[in-house]
Amino acid sequence: MPIGVPRVRFQYRRDRSRVWIDIYNRLYRERCLFLAHVVESQIANQLVGLFIYLGVQDETKDIFLFINSPGGGIISGFAIYDTMQFVRPDIQTICVGLAASMGSFLLVGGAITKRLAFPHARVMIHQPMSAFFETQTVEAILEAEELLKLRESLAKVYVQRTGKPDWVIAEDMERDVFLSATEAQSYGIVDVVGVALASKG
């Protein structure tokens, strides 16, 4: 049985009364955003709006994007990525479970030196799949050309942000490549692997 979204008490500034709001709403106010779904247009629009709002609200404080996503649409992923580069605050990206496909692309898109993976996180990169349209023959050719352009754009970002040679990225994108947190750090997708807190007592 689903437990629903937990609610927590919150007090607005200049208001003594407290209200109950869902935990994600509360965390958004602390500049903590979550990508815990397939990347698609609705999720992309929500994140784009939140990035812009938080960027305007305070240009000096970092924004935290927690990622646990199997990936999703290329265009939606680029919309999120481009907004991350557009806003003034640094975006700290944190992989808390799985960052696959467009999830790993957004993970690598965080501010350099501020990309983190939890110790048991997994990262997967691969080339974009054909998922634009139900195609006929001519449309399939046009789609293949568009996918090739998008693949080149993805590869260019990975090269710039990991420091890997373009031939390494091109070769690894030919198949599903799964990486542990430490392997993702060595690859240049993340900068830091989070460590567990020391046990109490």
Swiss-Prot record:
GO MF annotation: an example: ATP-dependent peptidase activity
Top-level division of the source organism's lineage: Eukaryota
Any single GO CC term annotated in Swiss-Prot or TrEMBL for this entry: endopeptidase Clp complex
Broad class of enzyme this protein falls into: hydrolase
Compartment(s) of residence: Plastid
Record: active site: S101 (nucleophile), H126
Catalytic activity: Hydrolysis of proteins to small peptides in the presence of ATP and magnesium. alpha-casein is the usual test substrate. In the absence of ATP, only oligopeptides shorter than five residues are hydrolyzed (such as succinyl-Leu-Tyr-|-NHMec, and Leu-Tyr-Leu-|-Tyr-Trp, in which cleavage of the -Tyr-|-Leu- and -Tyr-|-Trp bonds also occurs)
Gene Ontology BP term (one): protein quality control for misfolded or incompletely synthesized proteins
Record's keyword terms, sorted: Hydrolase, Plastid, Protease, Serine protease
Keyword Protease: yes
Gene3D superfamilies assigned: 2-enoyl-CoA Hydratase, Chain A, domain 1
Subunit (UniProt): Component of the plastid Clp protease core complex.
HAMAP family: ClpP (MF_00444)
Family the entry assigns: Belongs to the peptidase S14 family.
The protein's role, per its UniProt record: Cleaves peptides in various proteins in a process that requires ATP hydrolysis. Has a chymotrypsin-like activity. Plays a major role in the degradation of misfolded proteins.
Protein's name according to its UniProt entry: ATP-dependent Clp protease proteolytic subunit
